[in-house]
UniProtKB/Swiss-Prot annotation:
Pfam family, one: SurE
Biological function: Nucleotidase that shows phosphatase activity on nucleoside 5'-monophosphates.
Cofactor: a divalent metal cation
UniProt-annotated binding residues for a divalent metal cation: 19-20, 52, 110
UniProt keyword annotation of Transit peptide present: no
Species: Chlamydia caviae (strain ATCC VR-813 / DSM 19441 / 03DC25 / GPIC) (Chlamydophila caviae)
GO cellular component, one term: cytoplasm
Name used for this protein in its record: 5'-nucleotidase SurE 2
Sample GO molecular function, one term: 3'-nucleotidase activity
The enzyme's E.C. designation: 3.1.3.5
Subcellular location: Cytoplasm
Length: 283
């Protein structure tokens, strides 16, 4: 029996986290859809406050507080953490669940795209990458613009999340851990399907805006600016613009030589499209 078949037959243990905070609407949407799918016991360990754009930052110079959280939906357990998304993952895996690690970590659903160069800044991605470094497969989930995708009824959202979770467990984990970065498009068109693509170079974050002077101090605010797009847009960019879900592998490694060969990437694509076709989705 294959490892994926075994995963399909057992009830999973899934850790949920995010960077928008444990109270965020995206977490509520994720939990409610996973509860409908009813294939896993859900545990939430998420920031007590907004932690967007924290990437893989950790809290070193002050205590981090872990508190039980009375989550409004029937999860197996929930805790808030007074720190970053990576703090949440490290505390969950090294303390709360050290004797029985989760099968999978789902990070999100982030309000806003984490495509392109946003992967370097995103706390949603930071949590997923940290999880893979700790030996647990992970998926980062982000919705561009708003959460309209999860109100659409043109296909079964709970079943899609279940299948995506099982697919993530089938990815090759050695010699370099791989997280999945999933971005849902913002469009008034009907959602068409999924595409497995490489991460593009587009970005729009961290533009400094001068606000005012306070004595000798100058006050700035960093916020998103216009999207910077290449002359020939990336496949990831075009995928989202065409109302497809963009799924990209993110490797958790420091080696510049640790990339997929074209043949390896194409093999991953074939496996992914077999999965997408099983859901009746276009690609």
């Amino acid at each position: 029996m294959s490892e994926l078949s075994e995963q399909c037959e057992k009830r999973l243990k899934i850790l949920l986290t995010n960077d928008d905070g444990i109270f965020a609407p995206g977490m509520t949407l994720l939990v409610s859809n996973l509860l409908k799918a009813d294939f896993a016991d859900l545990y939430i360990v998420a920031p007590k406050t907004e932690q967007s754009a924290k990437s893989m930052a950790m809290t070193f110079h002050e205590p981090v507080i872990l508190q039980p959280y009375d989550y409004p939906l029937p999860v197996a357990g929930a805790w808030s953490v007074s720190g970053t998304p990576v703090d949440c993952v490290r505390i969950a895996l090294a303390y709360l669940f050290k004797d029985e690690l989760p099968d999978l970590v789902l990070s999100g659903i982030n309000r806003g795209s984490n495509a392109g160069r946003h992967v370097f800044y995103s706390g949603t991605l930071g949590a997923a990458i940290e999880s893979t470094l700790c030996g647990v497969p992970a998926v980062a989930l982000s919705q561009e613009g708003n959460f309209s995708f999860f109100q659409e009824k043109n296909f079964d959202i709970p079943e899609m999340l279940k299948s995506l979770s099982l697919y993530a467990l089938s990815l090759p984990f050695a010699p370099h851990p791989v997280a999945l970065n999933v971005n849902f498009p913002a469009s008034n068109e009907r959602w068409k399907g999924m595409r497995f693509v490489t991460t593009g170079p587009e970005y729009s974050c961290g533009v400094p805006h001068f606000l005012f002077c306070d004595g000798d101090s100058k006050i700035f605010k960093l916020s998103g600016g216009p999207k910077i797009v290449e002359e020939i847009p990336s496949e990831e960019w075009q995928t989202l613009r065409a109302s497809y879900i963009a799924v990209s592998p993110v490797m958790a490694t420091t080696s510049p030589l640790a990339t997929f060969s074209l043949e390896e990437f194409e093999q991953l694509q074939v496996g992914f499209y077999d999965f997408a076709n099983s859901l009746g989705m276009e690609n």
